[in-house]
Amino acid sequence: MHFSLKQLAVAAFYATNLGSAYVIPQFFQEAFQQEEPIENYLPQLNDDDSSAVAANIPKPHIPYFMKPHVESEKLQDKIKVDDLNATAWDLYRLANYSTPDYGHPTRVIGSKGHNKTMEYILNVFDDMQDYYDVSLQEFEALSGKIISFNLSDAETGKSFANTTAFALSPPVDGFVGKLVEIPNLGCEEKDYASVVPPRHNEKQIALIERGKCPFGDKSNLAGKFGFTAVVIYDNEPKSKEGLHGTLGEPTKHTVATVGVPYKVGKKLIANIALNIDYSLYFAMDSYVEFIKTQNIIADTKHGDPDNIVALGAHSDSVEEGPGINDDGSGTISLLNVAKQLTHFKINNKVRFAWWAAEEEGLLGSNFYAYNLTKEENSKIRVFMDYDMMASPNYEYEIYDANNKENPKGSEELKNLYVDYYKAHHLNYTLVPFDGRSDYVGFINNGIPAGGIATGAEKNNVNNGKVLDRCYHQLCDDVSNLSWDAFITNTKLIAHSVATYADSFEGFPKRETQKHKEVDILNAQQPQFKYRADFLII
């Protein structure tokens, strides 16, 4: 007897509704006579429409012990461009939930777009509850916004080129104040004691050179010694742009602070030399606030819990745009690898993480890493950071880790990426750790770390053009993705997961002591000069 796909669809329909896939309705027996075909009551299907048939047939559940052991090539083979594309469009639709509030799509923390992104990730894992344990880690993220600012010559009203306001700067009403140069970089109290302090109710502006200590320290000390605002000038003579920096978490002494290029700073010093009472007009409209948000952590139920393979991407974007490359691409890659990993057995536990508030200064990943107990810390064998996997004018970037300056194992991770690109005859570029992504908290706490990227605002070493023309802009949407880079790097992520989920053979054992116990915001000499996209020193 031969059944058409239409008849099989009817069988599936009735079998499902009778509660058993093994019940075959009697109307398929040859003796049964049907006056009007039952298909007339159902949506019509073409004989070759196998996908519609499959949708009506419950998929069998394969117990964990029956699954094949994870192999890199087999896991990579399950990564498909169509899946990446579908998830990218999903994220863009979620970013549009913010449009009524922001006037454009965004997934910045605190927005509906970011909240929907987190809901989306959790919904994906609802279908994988037999493979993963999912937890939320809530924290308060420090955020803020510079609405407007003005730094200009008090006499002429002329503003200064490439002046920038520091993130997390407090507001100040417009005022005219004498500009005072602070000696010795303004990092110690004695630097301020050497100048005449402002008189009671007198408003003055401190002019301080960049260097030695974080910008926040300079602002705090200036405020403590009575200055109403601060101008920090760059110490790099070739710099033409302003200082794109952050003050970090403000204190009661923090004052409104802006940055200017080296040449502008030297011009201001010359103006003071000509006129000891030289003054500026200074104003800033801004706010600083705390926003409650969450990290999402998904652990495999199986695998050795004392040998954890950890990897992460950040779930948020900047306010200016939807962030589909930065870091929607990393979010998408991790989700797709997590889905496909469920087809396999593993030897070591795998931990997928989506960090919130990366764009505010790596806040989610730092909160996680700094709040690990010593025992929890020691169980993480490696952390892999996946931020910006698909820049349109991409280069394959690998963090240039070594075991001398970084926790042991970081160099082995770098070599895994190098070997992969070489095996696929792809050129790659080694880039330094600079503090701009979520590996920072792990390295500072002794956990081997590294990662790959495809580049942001810098130029491609091969063609001299910007790597991501839409970096931190509204145009960072689905059209801003390189699908070649996206599929290649997602397969590499799958390779890294499969490799370490199988074995850490040849990988250094974890050191029992934390690598460096430092406060990256307030240390006199931070290990990295950046915190996310912001300079801190």
Curated annotation (Swiss-Prot):
The cross-references to InterPro entries, in alphabetical order and at most eight, read: M28_fam, M28_SGAP-like, PA_dom_sf, PA_domain, Peptidase_M28
Glycoprotein as UniProt keyword: yes
- Glycosylated where? 85, 96, 115, 150, 162, 371, 427, 480
The region annotated as signal peptide is 1-21
Propeptide segments, given as residue ranges: 22-56
Q: Which GO terms describe its molecular function?
A: aminopeptidase activity; metal ion binding; metalloexopeptidase activity
Q: Can you tell which superkingdom this protein's organism belongs to?
A: Eukaryota
| Key words of the record | Aminopeptidase, Glycoprotein, Hydrolase, Metal-binding, Metalloprotease, Protease, Signal, Vacuole, Zinc, Zymogen
Q: Which family does it belong to?
A: Belongs to the peptidase M28 family. M28A subfamily.
Q: What is this protein called?
A: Aminopeptidase Y
User: What is this protein's gene name?
Assistant: APE3
